[in-house]
Amino acid sequence: MVSIRPDEISSIIRQQIEQYSQDVKVENVGTVLQVGDGIARIYGLQQVMSGELVEFEDGTTGIALNLEEDNVGAVLMGEGRNIQEGSTVKATGKIAQIPVGDALVGRVVSPLGAPLDGKGEIAATENRLIESPAPGIIARRSVHEPMQTGITAIDAMIPIGRGQRELIIGDRQTGKTAIAIDTILNQKGEDVICVYVAIGQKASSVANIIEVLRERGALDYTVVVAANASEPATLQYLAPYAGAAIAEYFMCKGKATLVIYDDLTKQAQAYRQMSLLLRRPPGREAYPGDVFYLHSRLLERAAKLSDALGGGSMTALPVIETQAGDVSAYIPTNVISITDGQIFLSSDLFNSGLRPAINVGISVSRVGSAAQTKAIKKIAGTLKLELAQFDELAAFAQFASDLDKATQNQLARGQRLRELLKQPQFSPLILAEQVAVVYAGVKGLIDEIPVNQVTAFVSELRSYLKTSKPEFIEKVQSSKQLDDAAEALLKEAIAEVKKNILAAV
C-alpha cells in the first residue's frame, strides 16, 4: 500500500493555485426584441456606445444608432435573414473602421474595406475610423493651388482649387458623372490620388466607370468605393465617410487627393429610410432633423492642410441630383450652403447639344479664383461676363426683328464662344490648349470663322500646336504664364489655322 505524503500533496495543491489565472471574459450582451427592414430592436446592451458595432449570432454586423431607455435601435450591415427574435447580440467595443494603406490604390472596395474586384485580399497598413473630426482652423491654410479638371469651361470660368468643395448639381442624365470622371482622367501624371465613391448606383453603371478608368490608365491612381443600389441602406449611408477616410489617409501623408461622392442625394435617401424605420421624428420632405449635419460633417473633412501638417489636401466634388431643375429643394440648398461653389448643369442646354451643359449664369466658384493659374486668369476674365450677356441678349433677340450692328456682333461672338467651350467626353485639355482656345475666342480672332467650323478650328489648333509650335506648349506648361513670347507664338498658330479653315470653307 502506497503511503500518503501530505507534504507532497500540499506542494502540488500550492503549485496548482499559483498557476491558476482568473480568465473571466466580460461581454456586453443583449437580446433581439424585433428585427425587420434592416433594423433590429435590442433589449440589454447596457454599456453600448452610439455608433458602436454590434455582432449578431449569425455573424451579421450592425451599428447601434438609437440608444433609448429600454432598448437599442441598430441598423444592419447585411441581409440579416437568419437573425431571430430572442437571439443574442454582442457589443464589440469598436466604432466602424476601414482598413487603409497604399495597397488600396487601383482596387474596388466596399464601404467596410472588403475587396469587390476579385483580386484577393488587400494588404492594409492601418485602420482608420470611418467617422473622424474635420481639421480645425489652425490645421488648414487657404486654397491656393489649382485642381485642373481638363474641361475648359470649368478651368476658365469656375476654377477649382486643391482643398475646395465644389458641388456638381443637375437633373438626371445631364453629364454630372462625366465631369467627375473627366476630372479623374485629367489627374494623370499630377501625383493626385483619386477616390470615386459610388452610392446607390446600378452595378452596371459602376462597372462601366471602372472600365473607362482602367482603359485610360486612371485606375493606377484611383480607389473605387462602391455601395450599389442592391446593398443595405446602412452601407449606402456609410460609403461617403469611408471614401473620406481613405482620402484622409493619403492627405495626412502630404499627398493631394480628390474625392467624388456620386451622389449624395442617394445617401440622404438611405439615411432618411434608416431614420424613419428607427422612428426618429421626420422633418421637411420627411428627412430627419440632422440631415444637414449628415453632409456638413462629411464635406468639412475636405481641406488644404497647413505646411506644418505636411501640406496635403482633399478636394471634394459632391454630386447632387435635382428634380426638374429645382435647386431650392431641401438637400440641394443644404449642400449649396456647405460647399465653396457649384457647377450647375442644365437639361435644356444638354438637349440643345451644348456639352458639358454648364449654366454659366448660376455656376460659381467662391474660392477657386485664388488658385487659378495666371495664364488662364489673364485671358478668361471677361469670358463669363460675355457668355452671361450673350444668354440675356439671345433671349431678347427672339422677340426683336431688327438689331443694331453692335448687338449682332455680340450675339455672333457669343455663339462662337459657346461653340469653343463644347468638349467631347473623356478628352480633357491640358492648360496650354485651354489657354489657346480661350485666347482665340476672347480676343475675337475667330469672329470670321463660320459657327459650324469652330469645333473643327479647335481640333486643328490643338494638333497644330503639338506639331508646329511645341515650344508654346512647353512654355505655358512649365511657367503657367502667358508671356509676350508665348503670345506671339500663339497668334502665329491661330492665324495659320484660321487661314486653312477659311480656305476650306
Swiss-Prot record:
ATP binds at residues 170-177. Its main location: membrane. GO terms for cellular component: plasma membrane-derived thylakoid membrane; proton-transporting ATP synthase complex. It catalyses: ATP + H2O + 4 H(+)(in) = ADP + phosphate + 5 H(+)(out). It is found in: Cellular thylakoid membrane. One of its GO terms (molecular function) is ADP binding. The record marks 363 as: Required for activity. InterPro entries: ATP_synth_asu-like_sf, ATP_synth_asu_C, ATP_synth_asu_C_sf, ATP_synth_F1_a_nt-bd_dom, ATP_synth_F1_asu, ATPase_a/bsu_AS, ATPase_F1/V1/A1_a/bsu_N, ATPase_F1/V1/A1_a/bsu_N_sf. Its EC number is 7.1.2.2. Coiled coil: none annotated. It is a peripheral membrane protein. Keywords: ATP synthesis, ATP-binding, CF(1), Hydrogen ion transport, Ion transport, Membrane, Nucleotide-binding, Thylakoid, Translocase, Transport. F-type ATPases have 2 components, CF(1) - the catalytic core - and CF(0) - the membrane proton channel. CF(1) has five subunits: alpha(3), beta(3), gamma(1), delta(1), epsilon(1). CF(0) has four main subunits: a(1), b(1), b'(1) and c(9-12). Produces ATP from ADP in the presence of a proton gradient across the membrane. The alpha chain is a regulatory subunit. This is ATP synthase subunit alpha. It comes from Synechococcus elongatus (strain ATCC 33912 / PCC 7942 / FACHB-805) (Anacystis nidulans R2). The gene is atpA.
